[in-house]
Amino acid sequence: MAKGQSLQDPYLNALRRERIPVSIYLVNGIKLQGQIESFDQFVILLKNTVSQMVYKHAISTVVPARSVSHNNGGTSHTQQAPAVEAVADKAE
């Protein structure tokens, strides 16, 4: 596994395994919502009413709807969802 993905993979896997709803903000400001169905080195499959393949290079932020516990090389981390979202939805 690449050194840069040692945090990313366990975090995304915990979100997938626990079926935690997420908001994914893209670099262009678009907000996508759903559950992570699968992921690899380059893409995330996000499922809502349909499945979407989202390229990781287009993602700015992944925000879980609730706190998530994940294990990174024997060290346990807890990430909590923010109380207030700082990014506004982009009107189309």
From Swiss-Prot:
Sm domain segment(s): 9-68
GO BP, sorted A to Z: regulation of DNA-templated transcription; regulation of RNA stability; regulation of translation, ncRNA-mediated
SUPFAM superfamilies linked: Sm-like ribonucleoproteins
Superkingdom of origin organism: Bacteria
Positions of the UniProt region annotated as Disordered: 69-92
Xref: InterPro entries: Hfq, LSM_dom_sf, Sm
Keywords assigned: RNA-binding, Stress response
Cross-referenced PANTHER family: RNA-BINDING PROTEIN HFQ
Family note: Belongs to the Hfq family.
Main function: RNA chaperone that binds small regulatory RNA (sRNAs) and mRNAs to facilitate mRNA translational regulation in response to envelope stress, environmental stress and changes in metabolite concentrations. Also binds with high specificity to tRNAs.
Protein name according to UniProt: RNA-binding protein Hfq
Record organism: Actinobacillus pleuropneumoniae serotype 5b (strain L20)
Gene transcribed to yield this protein: hfq
